[in-house]
Amino acid sequence: MKVSAALLCLLLIAAALTTQVLTQPDAIISPVTCCYTLTNKKISIQRLASYKRVTSSKCPKEAVIFKTVLNKEICADPKQKWVQDSMAHLDKKSQTQTAKP
């Protein structure tokens, strides 16, 4: 009993400390991805590959989901300056890549 209670506590703590990206059905065709925890740590621009905004009314928080070069998704607060700077950098990077012949 003590072992299962300790394991449950450990799992709850681990879940609270990790960045969670959960998918909930918005409609039959397209799912909505929501962020429930936002990172407080700045992510190096070199580690970022892309991003998408989370603005669905079905989600509790407005967020930006960055995808890293290692294909990891990280939720961030779009009001933070580093997040805005990173999105601008990725936008500029994608424009220069699509402009090349």
UniProtKB/Swiss-Prot annotation:
One of its GO terms (cellular component) is extracellular space. The modification Pyrrolidone carboxylic acid is found at residue 24. Processing at the N-terminus can regulate receptor and target cell selectivity. Deletion of the N-terminal residue converts it from an activator of basophil to an eosinophil chemoattractant. N-Glycosylated. Keywords: Chemotaxis, Cytokine, Disulfide bond, Inflammatory response, Pyrrolidone carboxylic acid, Secreted, Signal. Disulfide bonds join 34-59, 35-75. CDD domains: Chemokine_CC. GO terms for molecular function: CCR chemokine receptor binding; chemokine activity. Endothelium of small veins and intrafascicular veins, and infiltrating leukocytes. The keyword Signal applies. Residues 1-23 form the signal peptide. Its main location: secreted. GO terms for biological process: antimicrobial humoral immune response mediated by antimicrobial peptide; chemokine-mediated signaling pathway; eosinophil chemotaxis; inflammatory response; positive regulation of cell migration; positive regulation of synaptic transmission, glutamatergic; sensory perception of pain. Induction: By TNF-alpha. It comes from the Eukaryota. It is found in: Secreted. Belongs to the intercrine beta (chemokine CC) family. Acts as a ligand for C-C chemokine receptor CCR2. Signals through binding and activation of CCR2 and induces a strong chemotactic response and mobilization of intracellular calcium ions. Exhibits a chemotactic activity for monocytes and basophils but not neutrophils or eosinophils. Plays an important role in mediating peripheral nerve injury-induced neuropathic pain. Increases NMDA-mediated synaptic transmission in both dopamine D1 and D2 receptor-containing neurons, which may be caused by MAPK/ERK-dependent phosphorylation of GRIN2B/NMDAR2B. This is C-C motif chemokine 2. It comes from Canis lupus familiaris. The lineage of its organism: Eukaryota, Metazoa, Chordata, Craniata, Vertebrata. The gene is CCL2.
